[in-house]
Swiss-Prot record:
Pathway info: Cofactor biosynthesis; coenzyme A biosynthesis; CoA from (R)-pantothenate: step 4/5
The protein, known as: Phosphopantetheine adenylyltransferase
NCBIfam families xref list: coaD_prev_kdtB (TIGR01510), cyt_tran_rel (TIGR00125)
Subunit description: Homohexamer.
EC number: 2.7.7.3
Compartments reported by the entry: Cytoplasm
């Protein structure tokens, strides 16, 4: 039986428990999930690509069916190069859906061999985003329930200034 491979793309700047929830749930459906970190994201990143990959690899170290990789260029080209058939996208709100729907339609127009699977975030993570985590952390707020401990420490290190 062929291996069912899905790609979960994103900037993951940084990875949160919301992302990890989607990965865990996707692994219930697929044999392998590739967490694909965007190298040339339009977003301005706090962490370098290498730092993001390292954090994700460390967080997922015990899961042999999750693999971390990077990509640039068109996502659909990367997905096809990995012999994956599904793109996983997490949705928090209807506003996420409108944008993601447009991207999914564009990907579908390029290749009908790849489907996009939208997964609603679990209730505790419905509001969670990397941007919120970075903002709260930059203001020295509590992020314990939002990111794994090693990510929390990396954020503290990034935001530690001479006056902290």
């Amino acid at each position: 039986m062929p291996t069912k491979i899905a790609v979960y793309p994103g900037s993951f700047d940084p990875i949160t428990y919301g992302h990890l929830d989607i990965i865990d749930r996707a692994l219930r459906i697929f044999d392998q999930v590739i967490v694909a970190v965007a190298r040339n994201s339009a977003k301005s990143a706090l962490f370098t690509t290498d730092e993001r990959v390292d954090m994700i690899q460390r967080v997922l170290a015990d899961n042999v069916r999750a693999r971390v990789d990077t990509f640039d260029g068109l996502l659909i080209d990367y997905v096809l190069s990995q012999k994956a058939t599904v793109i996983i996208r997490g949705l928090r709100a209807i506003s996420d859906f409108e944008y993601e729907f447009q991207i999914a339609q564009m990907n579908r127009s390029i290749s009908q061999d790849v489907e996009t699977l939208f997964m609603m975030t679990s209730v505790p993570y419905g509001y969670l985003s990397s941007s919120i985590v970075k903002e709260v952390s930059s203001l020295n707020g509590p992020i314990d329930g939002l990111v794994p401990p090693l990510v929390r420490q990396a954020l503290r290190d990034k935001f530690a200034g001479p006056d902290r």
